[in-house]
Amino acid sequence: MTDLNRIRNFSIVAHIDHGKSTLADRLIQLTGTVAARDMQAQLLDQMDIERERGITIKANTVRIEYPAKDGHTYILNLIDTPGHVDFAYEVSRSMQAVEGSLLVVDASQGVEAQTLANVYQAIDADHEIVPVLNKVDLPAAEPDRVREQIEDVIGIDASEAVEISAKTGIGIPDVLEAIVTRLPAPKGDRDAPLKAMLVDSYYDSYLGVVVLIRVIDGVIKKGDKIKMMRTGGQYPVDRLGVFTPKMKDIGELGPGEMGFLTASIKQVRDTRVGDTITHDKHGAEQPLAGFKPSQPVVFCGLFPVDTNQFEDLRDAIEKLALNDASFSHEMETSAALGFGFRCGFLGLLHLEVIRDRLEREYDIDLITTAPSVIYHVHMRDETMVDLHNPADMPDPAAIDRIEEPRIKATILVPDDYLGDVLKLCQDRRGIQIDLTYAGTRAMVVYDLPLNEVVFDFYDRLKSVTKGYASFDYQMIGYREDALVKMQVLVNDEPVDALSIMVHRDRAETRGRAMVEKLKDLIPRHMFKIPIQAAIGGRVIARETLSAMRKDVTAKCYGGDASRKRKLLDKQKAGKKKMRQFGKVEIPQSAFISALKMDG
């Protein structure tokens, strides 16, 4: 049993690439938690894709024992949380599970948008925050300027910020001392009924679902029968332990402690992040506050390039869903692409990560249709339909109005590029909410429609600011707008995978750009092919792909003109018939390129 005053629970908050996972590695290394021979970079990021992209996707915990200068040994529980906006709910749960945060800021780059988003979550969770300036060994580091920036932008005292270099190990002992002296100890009652927060869970092929927990009150022992308060599931505890980062079994976990349990849970879906775990008999009365199931925000279709791989794709998606409860999927068929799945994601990074994992870990070539968001379609008969896929749009005559999701986007940008960023946001139908300056950087807050952001906003933002802008967003609700469904017809056949929802004012430009692009991408056939963009029955843009021509009169030497005429008429009749029955093959690259467009 560990004395509560000897425990410190903390998380590390940072923007991508500011050195969060490296600092975690150093803390683990310095305290000898992992033997030197087992040490590897980004130790807590267990997926290859996390290491490769340098991002953390799932929350991970590690227990570190640290003999402090005051002669006592402290137990430090670190949660390494994701830094990206798509995983904001995982971050908020992890924040609730700890009492303090280390705010890591790159001393050469300063405060970024995601630093802000995550710090505000830490402040909301009443955290004690210790600022840490990383990368002070770089020639470009300006610790004093960044200190001022932290005070101006975030509003917390940075005069005692710890200066470190996680790469070389400078200042790491000071961080450990700051954790012990400046962060608060957890509170909790050992004799109260068990209350533990479910911080995260993942699927292990040997153990089933492994659940990361933080005990708030009471004690949990191996062999106890536990109950999930939100889902109602009851399970016996098979194993109980802590991560050092390897799994180490222990007999019990008391208040303030973090660890893992396994309880023959079959699916990750049965364990909701943020749920409350208690004993099935004499359990807690009330669950912990603040739980909300994660809702997918972005939808897109995933289809195998080779239709024979459909079964492999189904198995792969089901395996991934075991480990990711926020990822939803259902089967769909498309006339153009065959069988596939309509999948829901928390955001664009989540979509890319899942797609990369399917292609890399399961070796499946995928076609991804245009990402779309959920529209609320209010019908004239007062009912409301959630529209996930533009191809399923109800009859326009029966629709009263359509509402689209809006987001509040916070963009931090050097003021040299501010004009370009404002123009980009205006082009995407944004409404400016706020504009403030901190030193040489501007912070812009915009209200933007999510469907304008979802496709290539982030890429465009990075290109107009040469990569210097950082971006973060949160959902703020739905608003009515003049939205229409635009279809693309190739050879008079609608191509369902290219249907998109657009704003009426921008439909024509978008339609024209799309048909021009398709004209370049679709290979020529023996007959001419009209490519049209249409709203309802009205064609708004058209291009014609001319036919390949075979010279049928080549073998006529001199002779009668009517002989040539006869051959040409015969060819014309053949082409007409061909056009009537011919199928136009649209190559895979054309789908992706036609949907990725500026404007």
Swiss-Prot record:
Gene Ontology MF term list: GTP binding; GTPase activity; guanosine tetraphosphate binding; ribosome binding; translation elongation factor activity
Pfam families: EFG_C, GTP_EFTU, GTP_EFTU_D2, LepA_C
InterPro entries attached to this UniProt entry: EF-4, EFG_III/V, EFG_V-like, EFTu-like_2, G_TR_CS, LepA_C_sf, LepA_CTD, LepA_IV
Membrane topology, as annotated: Peripheral membrane protein
Top EC category: hydrolase
Coiled-coil region: none
Enzyme Commission number, as recorded: 3.6.5.n1
Catalytic activity as recorded in UniProt: GTP + H2O = GDP + phosphate + H(+)
Gene3D superfamilies in the record: 3.30.70.240, Elongation factor 4, C-terminal domain (3.30.70.2570), Elongation Factor G (Translational Gtpase), domain 3 (3.30.70.870), P-loop containing nucleotide triphosphate hydrolases (3.40.50.300), Translation factors (2.40.30.10)
Domain tr-type G: 5-187
Residues given in the record as GTP binding sites: 17-22, 134-137
Domain of life of the source: Bacteria
Major location (coarse): membrane
Family according to the record: Belongs to the TRAFAC class translation factor GTPase superfamily. Classic translation factor GTPase family. LepA subfamily.
Biological function: Required for accurate and efficient protein synthesis under certain stress conditions. May act as a fidelity factor of the translation reaction, by catalyzing a one-codon backward translocation of tRNAs on improperly translocated ribosomes. Back-translocation proceeds from a post-translocation (POST) complex to a pre-translocation (PRE) complex, thus giving elongation factor G a second chance to translocate the tRNAs correctly. Binds to ribosomes in a GTP-dependent manner.
Record's protein name: Elongation factor 4
